[in-house]
Amino acid sequence: MTNTPANAATVGIGWRHPHYGELLEQLPSLDFIEVHSENFFAAGGAALATLRQGRAHYPVSLHGVGLALGSAVGIDAWHLDQLARLVEQIEPIRVSDHACFARGQAQGEQIHAADLLPIPFNAAALDVLCANVQRVQERLKRQLLVENLSAYVSFTSSDQLEPDFLNALTQRTGCGLLVDVNNIYVNALNEQLAGRCPDPLAACLTWVDAIAPASVGQLHLAGHINMGDVVIDDHGSRVREPVWQIYRHAQARFGNAPALIEWDTDVPQLAVLLEEAALAKTT
């Protein structure tokens, strides 16, 4: 048996539908669970009842994919209302979403991309992101954590490095950061494929070192897939060894921030997620 260090990070898993019943039956030792906020927006029903059961046994973190914090058209009022209601009902330990956009306007009508799309790292995009984050925090009356994105395109209009951009966001809004370690590595691998990053691991460690430690409220860990011409953050496999290396560096830098194992594609047995969570505790 591996002894857990006294100063080990708090670690949770993403609680997905295939494991709803099994988790509640087994009640394994976990520091917290995380769910996708939008899956529980319905008023009442089986999903919310299940989440309430989980909340009775574990602290819950709400992780969103739909606020579209970087969208110039602003925050969707209905979406924010549903999130605020869920936060009031569940009283989560953390609430988070992504530094991305998903909504825009075409021919006078709003459209939704149904995906997490990257934003440029420049002053104009920062102004939009800050305004939207502030609106969410004012509505929820609590701090929001903002996650760095896995981005498959870059913008010629970007004139800031991502860590500097995120640091400025936290300074202006008081929000925190959810640092997705796998996303950092996926982006570096794709930059290597594009001929712009000779040493992805070193680039990731530099990225981590550039982030203000006090702003980091949580880490994400996940797997990715190399398609040959692009690396995809698919959350469909175990955490890769280079990501563990970056994670160890991040924990030393950020002071053992809470960490979460994400697995959303080809979801395995619950035992596999628990094994990964145990590694995050002891790595």
Model-derived features: where do they sit?
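Acidic/histidine-rich catalytic cores of soluble enzymes
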Residues: 137-229
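Acidic-and-aromatic substrate-binding clefts and catalytic sites of carbohydrate-active enzymes
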Residues: 18-20, 37-49, 68-78, 152-160, ...
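C-terminal helical cap(s) of enzyme catalytic domains, especially alpha/beta-barrels
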Residues: 270-283
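Boundary/entry segment of secreted carbohydrate-active catalytic domains
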Residues: 1-22
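Acidic (Asp/Glu)-rich catalytic clusters
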Residues: 22-28, 45-62, 78-93, 134-139, ...
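Gly/Pro-rich active-site loop or hairpin
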Residues: 42-44, 74, 116-126, 187-254
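Active-site acidic/histidine proton-transfer and metal-coordination neighborhood
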Residues: 76-177, 241
